[in-house]
């Protein structure tokens, strides 16, 4: 009885089992039974299936291996593609730079862009930036949803700009294959960036998906065990009293976190892309404004010969390289009675050549006034290449090239035979001299109004044009127009046409002209119209105009200077009149000397008139009237001005 009682004693039985277990440890199970056990088994709850875990882990590892293998292939291939695109971009940038600004090599391939400006160069450069960023930031840890959105937006904006360009006939006919392809290529660069972002998102989700599924399964098992543990603990507490619970195992969530370096890289990339977005927003507004202005001025063109005025575009050669915008008033096609000695003899056609920073819209108003007063019968204006509505010329350009282009456009294409009285204002005086010299057979007389001297085409002309000071040094000024030797360097009296900017400054302005913010303020703040932006005061902010000024500046002291000097002898028998500004002559003795030299280019100089007012004589009432009288005397029609 006693033995049986001892055998049935739970405490003794536990002690004996403990002794046996300590003597034979290999008999112990690998994991003791515990309600928190996640291993081999638990007497108090369900156990995790080890076979399932091993199979699941193997599947995950195999999936991740395949995904990462595909990712490495994707990175390798994308680097090759992007490097090739950047190489093509760089070659294209250099080619465009040379072709648009120094020598037209596109003509070798039969391509032309009659709407060339700084836009193409800017778009190609942005394309290089986009492809470079695609290459540098094409990593799994650098994916950003914002970058994807920016790439898509920039791609659409670029295509929208191209659509605006193709919206109207004028720009659609002139942009050409090269200009169109530039827009498409830039859009393609942003499209590539969006595709790469999409692939990064795909691989990011593919890598995280199996881990996320495993996490969900582990979380479900953990939740089940936790619920079972809570019920067991509650039962233990009720049986053995309160105790401290053991922390439950939790699987860590697979999160898409970035390191500090990655955040800096993402922030830098997105900042640059955001700046590009701002640029494209301004670029789009500029394109929209230019499209509206151009449409307003060209949608009714050409105006046919049946109208009182004639306005059309004419090619400059048989190859149809580009077109000049020509406007005429009066019957310029009537060739009858040109040799008649009667009173009904037709006057010569006044052919006006505008200045360096204007068109006939501004500087020919004094001739327009004579026409409306019926003092002259007919006159023609044209915009030089890159000015107003005339096409952008191929590089290089010189005065003689423009003169030859004008002759073909007038005589061959427009069938305006002349004869002409050529009138040149400011820089246009040099173009008038060369055109007259090359066409003495169709030119009756020539008039130069505040004309440039050929010496102004040379690079160091400003130092010689400035009034002399008390010193002979030229060490730079102090910002107030004086240098250390007392020499006056105040250039404020110089007209903007004469104070020519150097090539770098023209280049810099041209690059920023793509934004068009000065053109935007012209209508937002100054309330200027379309003609002012295309022909008038705001034309100097147009990218096509700045490109033409750059081309003129590059060749001025080489080709253009030689054109003027080589054709000087042909002018000796041309009837000529000279008009000079009194203010300009008084401010610079050298300017007066140069004007005097102009009176000697012909043996048949009729008069040299110094009129009241400044360089822009058409703005001064008395000076304008005096200039009109000189023109009428030159063509033998002065009596009409004094008639009641």
UniProtKB/Swiss-Prot annotation:
Residues 112-122, 169-174, 293-644 are vacuolar. GO terms for molecular function: catalytic activity. The lineage of its organism: Eukaryota, Fungi, Dikarya, Ascomycota, Saccharomycotina. The keyword Phosphoprotein applies. Residues 14-26 have a biased composition (Basic and acidic residues). Keywords: Membrane, Phosphoprotein, Transmembrane, Transmembrane helix, Vacuole. The chain crosses the membrane at residues 91-111, 123-143, 148-168, 175-195, 272-292. Residues 1-90, 144-147, 196-271 are cytoplasmic. It is found in: Vacuole membrane. PANTHER family: SI:DKEY-122A22.2. Residues 239-251 have a biased composition (Polar residues). InterPro entries: AB_hydrolase_1, AB_hydrolase_fold, DUF2417, Meta-cleavage_hydrolase. Gene3D superfamilies: alpha/beta hydrolase. It is a multi-pass membrane protein. SUPFAM superfamilies: alpha/beta-Hydrolases (SSF53474). The modification Phosphoserine is found at residues 22, 56, 63, 244. GO terms for cellular component: fungal-type vacuole; fungal-type vacuole membrane. It comes from Saccharomyces cerevisiae (strain ATCC 204508 / S288c) (Baker's yeast). This is Uncharacterized vacuolar membrane protein YNL115C. Pfam families: Abhydrolase_1, DUF2417.
């Amino acid at each position: 009885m006693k033995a049986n009682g001892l055998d049935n004693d739970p405490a003794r039985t536990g002690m004996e089992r403990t002794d046996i277990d300590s003597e034979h440890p290999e008999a112990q199970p690998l994991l003791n039974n515990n309600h928190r056990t996640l291993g081999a088994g638990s007497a108090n709850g369900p156990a995790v299936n080890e076979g399932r875990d091993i199979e699941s882990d193997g599947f995950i590892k195999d999936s991740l291996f395949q995904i990462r293998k595909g990712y490495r292939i994707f990175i390798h291939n994308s680097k090759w593609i992007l490097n090739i695109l950047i190489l093509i971009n760089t070659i294209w940038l250099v080619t465009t730079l040379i072709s648009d600004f120094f020598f037209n090599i596109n003509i070798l391939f039969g391509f032309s862009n009659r709407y060339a400006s700084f836009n193409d160069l800017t778009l190609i450069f942005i394309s290089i930036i986009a492809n470079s960023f695609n290459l540098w930031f094409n990593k799994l840890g650098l994916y950003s949803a914002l970058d994807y959105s920016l790439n898509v937006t920039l791609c659409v904006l670029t295509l929208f700009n191209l659509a605006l360009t193709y919206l109207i006939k004028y720009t659609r006919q002139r942009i050409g294959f090269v200009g169109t392809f530039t827009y498409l290529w830039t859009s393609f660069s942003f499209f590539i960036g969006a595709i790469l972002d999409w692939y990064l998102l795909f691989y990011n989700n593919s890598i995280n998906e199996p881990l996320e599924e495993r996490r969900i399964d582990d979380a479900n098992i953990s939740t089940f065990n936790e619920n079972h543990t809570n019920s067991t603990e509650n039962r233990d507490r009720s049986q053995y009293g309160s105790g401290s619970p053991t922390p439950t195992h939790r699987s860590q969530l697979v999160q898409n976190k970035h390191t500090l370096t990655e955040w800096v890289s993402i922030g830098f990339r997105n900042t640059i892309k955001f700046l590009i977005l701002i640029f494209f927003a301004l670029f789009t507004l500029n394109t929209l404004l230019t499209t509206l202005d151009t449409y307003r001025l060209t949608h009714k063109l050409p105006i046919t010969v049946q109208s009182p005025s004639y306005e059309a575009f004419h090619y400059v050669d048989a190859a149809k390289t580009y077109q000049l915008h020509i406007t005429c008033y009066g019957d310029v096609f009537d060739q009858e009675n040109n040799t008649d000695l009667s009173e009904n003899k037709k006057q010569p056609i006044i052919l006006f050549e505008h200045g360096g920073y204007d068109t006939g819209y501004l500087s020919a108003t004094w001739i327009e006034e004579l026409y409306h007063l019926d003092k002259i019968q007919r006159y023609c204006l044209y915009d030089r290449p890159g000015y107003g509505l005339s096409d952008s010329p191929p590089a290089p350009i010189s005065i003689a090239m423009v003169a030859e282009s004008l002759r073909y456009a007038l005589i061959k294409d427009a069938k305006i035979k002349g004869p002409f009285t050529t009138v040149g204002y400011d820089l246009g005086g040099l173009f008038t001299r060369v055109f007259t010299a090359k066409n003495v057979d169709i030119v009756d007389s020539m008039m130069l109004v505040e004309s440039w001297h050929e010496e102004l085409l040379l690079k160091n002309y400003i130092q010689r044009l400035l009034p002399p000071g008390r010193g002979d040094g030229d060490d730079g000024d102090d910002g107030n127009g004086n240098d250390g030797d007392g020499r006056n360097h105040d250039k404020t009296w110089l007209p903007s046409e004469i104070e020519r900017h150097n090539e770098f400054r023209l280049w810099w302005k041209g690059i920023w002209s793509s934004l068009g913010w000065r053109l935007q303020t012209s209508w937002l703040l100054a309330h200027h119209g379309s003609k002012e932006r295309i022909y008038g005061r705001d034309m100097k902010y147009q990218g096509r105009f700045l490109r033409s000024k750059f081309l003129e500046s590059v060749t001025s002291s080489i080709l253009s200077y030689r054109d003027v000097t080589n054709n000087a002898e042909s002018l000796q028998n041309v009837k000529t009149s000279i008009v000079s500004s009194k203010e300009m002559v008084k401010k610079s003795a050298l300017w007066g000397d140069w004007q005097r030299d102009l009176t000697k280019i012909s043996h048949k100089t009729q008069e040299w008139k110094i009129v009241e007012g400044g360089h822009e004589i058409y703005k001064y009432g008395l000076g304008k009237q005096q200039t009109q009288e000189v023109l009428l005397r030159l063509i033998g029609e002065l009596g009409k001005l004094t008639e009641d």
